[in-house]
Amino acid sequence: MESSRRPLGLTKPSAGXIIKIEAERISPSRLQLLNPIPGVWFPITLGFRALPNSRREKSFSLHKDKECLLPMESQLHSKRDIGTDTTDVPLKHLMASRSSYCPDGIFTILEQGPMLAQSMATISKELSGSQANRPRLGPLPILLKGTQVAMRLFLLGLRPVRYCLKVFMLKAQEGLHLLVDLVRGHNPVGQIIALEAVPTSASLPLL
């Protein structure tokens, strides 16, 4: 009769009771780690929560790990568009098979599409041709256009505009006189007469 009675006070629970208590304390988030998630790897050790000691080395070993999938997308996004080599070694091994992955950690397009390369070539040819065929204006046509613009702006009657134009015309006259002296040493007399025929300050309206 006494052996069938339950002893009073604290008793040491059995191994089965300990496993049951530990299983009840596991949260749903921890239970999700035991299920394989496609796309990611991480090592998880199934066994007691305590570290192995000399008594348990035969029954419990860290080498018997179960590999499960772990999300690596957050790490990949964090390493994106980085110019320096800050990627981890495991990440490099995981991404070595991707064609858009470069060793310096930059995700980029390695080759341009045929249509894109063709269009860029035609655009560059058009730009180079337009620059080559574009006539270069000499100093005399530029001064003539500037004089025409100045004559139109004089009609506005604004003092700041007139002041700026006065300074501009004085600088233009100074450059024109220097240009005449330069042309006299290198060009025939006909071009000198053409340069001297440019209207001076006497033919312009008074400021």
UniProtKB/Swiss-Prot annotation:
Localisation per UniProt entry: Virion
Keywords: Virion
GO CC term (a single one): virion component
Main location: virion
InterPro entries: Corona_nucI, N2-like_embe-CoV
General function of this protein: Structural protein that is not essential for the viral replication either in tissue culture or in its natural host.
Note: The gene encoding this protein is included within the N gene (alternative ORF).
Pfam family of the protein (one): Corona_I
Similarity-based family: Belongs to the coronaviruses I protein family.
Protein name (record): Protein I
